[in-house]
Amino acid sequence: MDYREAGVDIQAGRSFVEKIRQGVESTYRREVLGGLGGFGGYFELPQGYQHPVLVSGTDGVGTKLKIAQALNQHHTIGIDLVAMCVNDVLTCGAEPLFFLDYLATGKLNPQQLSDVVQGIVEGCRLSGCALLGGETAEMPGFYPVGEYDVAGFCVGIVEKSKILDGSQVNIGDIAIGLASSGVHSNGFSLVRKIVEVNGLNWSDRPQLLNGQTLGEVLLTPTQLYVKPILNALNSGLDIHAMAHITGGGLPENLPRCLDKGQSVEIIDKSWNILPIFQWIAQQGQISPASMYETFNMGIGFVVIVPPEKAQLAVNFLENQGILAYEIGKVIEGKGEVVIESND
């Protein structure tokens, strides 16, 4: 008996690395030293920082993977993975430098996982960060056939004096919401339960979704905010804090970027609520409060700016190609999000 008979094909693993090599190396920045295949990845710190601080983040894609695997559509999952990590690192003002991935599966399917890596490559290119390395684990008996899991790791850099940690936020500051591309990568356990309980299929075309299938809309990749936000910071736009709206929605994530004694008042429906959220609420009979506590509700990232700079911020970000809305303001409070009706 050998390792291959036990379910681990080392040669297939080598072939997979060669299959993805060109794409991976296309993401390299000038600071990358060496190439793919070493025990570690080398990255030289960029020049021009007086007191550079490294910022790290790690995340996954959750049960959105179940939909991708059910539909055999894997190319957008890699973008999700990168976005979940780089958007987090971005919130303190850091520029993402490099990314690492971990892929685990029961039996290596080179085409399936190369589709995933192709998405990771695209996400890294769009974010300006290098795919510095990764691990592909073939674990027979651990995952059902055709299933896999992914995790990502990102490291960024920020000047110490420019770290956005909430201490710059003032009462009266304005919350600018940046549009999400859809559900992003959170809340999918609830979505999957709704589909199961109602006897629906990913190929269904609900009237609310304007001809698109449910699967197509749900697999829309997570929006990457890196380039527009870095451009805003580099232009000198006065940004006091930022938040990535992930699991827990606005109520869970906005308070993470505030100072003590502060809350945020959000004006309900002061932005475009995407049809997919209306569909989820209707099909699942979910209360507005629960929707806000589970999903991003059309706002994937929030920038806090002084009131006199709010319109400038909206205009600048929209010129970067992303919809931006004034969605609320910072008020005195105990680290809460207060959602006020716009009716």
From Swiss-Prot:
Pfam families: AIRS, AIRS_C
Any single Gene Ontology cellular-component annotation: cytosol
Keywords on record: ATP-binding, Cytoplasm, Ligase, Nucleotide-binding, Purine biosynthesis
Molecular function in Gene Ontology: ATP binding; phosphoribosylamine-glycine ligase activity; phosphoribosylformylglycinamidine cyclo-ligase activity
Subcellular location: Cytoplasm
InterPro entries the record matches: PurM-like_C_dom, PurM-like_C_sf, PurM-like_N, PurM-like_N_sf, PurM_cligase
Catalytic reaction equation(s): 2-formamido-N(1)-(5-O-phospho-beta-D-ribosyl)acetamidine + ATP = 5-amino-1-(5-phospho-beta-D-ribosyl)imidazole + ADP + phosphate + H(+)
Keyword Hydrolase in record: no
EC nos: 6.3.3.1
GO biological process: 'de novo' IMP biosynthetic process; adenine biosynthetic process
Pathway listed: Purine metabolism; IMP biosynthesis via de novo pathway; 5-amino-1-(5-phospho-D-ribosyl)imidazole from N(2)-formyl-N(1)-(5-phospho-D-ribosyl)glycinamide: step 2/2
Keyword GTP-binding: no
NCBIfam families noted in UniProt: purM
Family, per entry: Belongs to the AIR synthase family.
Protein's name according to its UniProt entry: Phosphoribosylformylglycinamidine cyclo-ligase
